[in-house]
Amino acid sequence: FMDGDCYVCIQVDGATDYYASYTRLPKQSSPKEVSLVKDLEEGAHTVSVYKATEDMCVSFEVYSLSTDGFFTDPPEKPELKIEAYGDSLTAGRGTMRENGDKETDASSQENALLTYAACASRELGAEYRAFAVSGARVGKYDQSAANVIPQMISKYSPTANAKKTWNFSSWRPDVVIVDLGTNDVVGHKRNLFTSENFDEELKAQYKSFIERLKTLYPDSAIVLCCGTFSYSQMDHEKYNRLFAEVAESFSAEKKVYCHAFSPSTKGHPTHTETA
């Protein structure tokens, strides 16, 4: 996703179509005024803007908001909070394409609001946040720490130049979804790194990450999700079992669970498959 395009979903008055509201923002190197919504009928309206493409596509910052009317107090936020950590599956890669469409690296195919985690959060009426990086792993098997989620989550933003650190006490989720391990397995199959005891290393590093999350969020339930990505060389049954064993290694009071999905038709799931 190096084309530098940024897409957002602009929802007006509670609209729920995150496919139709997918909007490209013009790329700018300096602040520029952008019109998000116009020609609304006179009266009170609620406008929500969600970033749909991940940080490696492009970052954007809101400096101020203006209106030709006036701002009222925002609606109350949902009580239930769900947070997700993941790779391209959580970032929404490929979700903007239809079944049968060829998958590309264009950011225009990515919509994080159409992933299963985002859809489930809306079904449950929950506030949703995601920390997702395409190509990300849960384990570090060589000297490179690039795209290793446990070494990135303390950043406010995944980009290497992000200087702000994230305050985990500022927003405590009730449920944490973790969908990682796919790129670990794919990378190992493609010999992108060497590991003599890969399965055991993967299991140990995944468990270590969950232990860290339980330290940060001791009262949160954690759900390990797996099996979504369709890759011919991946033994889904074997690795779904491995991820289940990670969850089962925690005592019942820790509230760590595992859920395996059916693989997509090809590669990353489309928006109809995630729904």
Features from the language model and the residues they span:
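Generic structural signal for well-ordered alpha-helices
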Residues: 206-211, 240-244
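N-terminal cationic-hydrophobic initiation segments that often serve targeting/anchoring roles
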Residues: 121, 213-215, 248-251
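Extracellular serine-dependent O-acyl
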Residues: 220-228, 235-275
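Short, conserved loop/helix-junction motifs that constitute active-site signature segments
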Residues: 77, 171, 215-217
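Extended, compositionally biased non-globular segments
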Residues: 197-202, 208-221
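N-terminal secretory targeting modules
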Residues: 1-85, 90-109
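Conserved SGNH/GDSL esterase-like catalytic core that processes O-acyl groups on lipids
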Residues: 102-203, 231-240, 265-268, 272
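Structural recognition of the beta-strand scaffold that forms the well-ordered cores
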Residues: 81-85, 90, 128-132, 174-179, ...
